Amino acid sequence: MKKTFFIADLHLSENRPHLTELFVQFMQTQALQAEKLYILGDLFDFWIGDDEQSALIETVQQQILQLSQKGIPCYFIHGNRDFLVGRHFANSCGMELLPTYQIVNLYGKKVLICHGDTLCTDDLAYQQYRKKVQQKWLQWLFLHLPLKVRLKIAEKIRQKSKTDKTHKSIEIMDVNKDFVEQIMQQFQVNILIHGHTHKQNIHQNPPHFTRIVLGDWGATASVLEVSANGFQFI
């Protein structure tokens, strides 16, 4: 039976090698059973430019490339941690970059997919930050800084993000349900798949909509399998 896999929020980094091991294991086993793989953001814990080189980046690049060479396409939507992943890296591993919101047809079902950070509209501070860092001129300026400087800036942003989370309520950092319904109506879909919140679940509100939230990776991998039979986490 044909199936499509969705993953997100792996937050791969040199500091957590077990996550890279999980990713390699997934790519060399389960991923080979899919006809398509979608990565909905935050594959990396941070990304400072396609010119950075490391053992981690090379491993990920090789795993995605090997999958695409086997005829299994891989699609990527930027997350809030790796929004600077560019075409150079994507092309090097045969991966296709998708826009913030993308409609896909999954076995007769029209589905909207996204990372999910744009759905958290109650987190005003984050949305203001996102608006700033999405400016092309600022991205261009950042990417032309020396690698060492970019690394320091990225580390400061990560630390600030951790600090900010301790002062925010769980509700503020979750999706705004009214905005979710608005987006789904705008794209004329009744199924949405996203990540970002790390709250793996399948929310069903028939006959209106189904919202599937991908989980983050920790001790185990979180993979959503979609087939003609429906949706399930494996």
Curated annotation (Swiss-Prot):
Textual note on the cofactor: Binds 2 Mn(2+) ions per subunit in a binuclear metal center.
Recorded topology in the membrane: Peripheral membrane protein
EC number(s) stated in the UniProt entry for this protein: 3.6.1.54
GO cellular component: cytoplasm; extrinsic component of plasma membrane
Names of the cofactor(s): Mn(2+)
Main location: membrane
UniProt-annotated binding residues for substrate: 80-81, 123, 161, 165, 168, 196
Function text: Hydrolyzes the pyrophosphate bond of UDP-2,3-diacylglucosamine to yield 2,3-diacylglucosamine 1-phosphate (lipid X) and UMP by catalyzing the attack of water at the alpha-P atom. Involved in the biosynthesis of lipid A, a phosphorylated glycolipid that anchors the lipopolysaccharide to the outer membrane of the cell.
The protein's name: UDP-2,3-diacylglucosamine hydrolase
Organism: Histophilus somni (strain 129Pt)
Name of the gene encoding the protein in the UniProt record: lpxH
